[in-house]
Amino acid sequence: MLASPGALWQDCSGVQSGELQAMNCPQCGVLNEPANVTCVRCGAALPAASSARGAAAMPVRRVFRDPKRLTKWLIWLLVAGIVCDAVFAISELAQHQLLIRMRDGGFASELELMSAAEANDLRHGIIGIAVMLVVITTIVLFAVWIHRVSSNLHALGTPGLRFTPGWAVGWYFVPIANLWKPFQAMKEIWRASKNPGAWQSETISPVLGWWWFWWIVSSIVSNVSLRMSLRAEALDELISVGPVNIASSVLDVISAIFALLVVKKIGSFQAMAADRSLGAVFA
């Protein structure tokens, strides 16, 4: 006998919501959301909540992954970047003084001038390559770290999140929007990492605002420095761009210091969130 339309609707609605129950992980005992197939803490496979589970659509699921090691590596890279930028600023100052000396005829002979210029180019070139390698590696790892900590918030079942892990990273590469969207995403990550269950009421530290301020300022000055360096050909032009390059390196140091503080704090928040009972998060 065929079931009535009303009965069919009741069966379907039960599959979608009514029959799904929260469950404890058989391995670590943490309470998990009904839709989870693996434990958000230990990653163990979860038993089906009901026979209707297999009929339900499978949503995208994320597993909490401890960011401690990633955070540690990123902090070391930021420290390396701070050191490299500081050394580069000193080298840039030495080059600036060399150019002024060349302009003012401060060398006794052309041989002395050529020797000083070659030593400067070698030193500055090696330091520049080191800075570039550290910067590229830091950018890649920073993007991976942002994706990881954002993904963890979704794995914890944090309610009301506006940014996906992909867009928490992606907004950095969207012109114009990258002036504020990445900061909004980082604010969300900061607040939600501090209190996943009720993050909307959490405040942020001034450190986060200062990080973004110096990030924007250093990015603008670095862009100006690059454009001026590419156009500079005459000796006077090379001398003029020197102070801008030095300022750019100093601002990069300041920006990296605040970035380090932000990364360290969010990493600490997520470590505490992982150690707490996730049953309270989903309550």
Task: Put a short name on every predicted segment.
Residues 120-136, 243-255:
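Hydrophobic alpha-helical transmembrane segments
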Residues 16-20, 30-33:
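Short, flexible, mixed-charge glycine/proline-rich loop motifs
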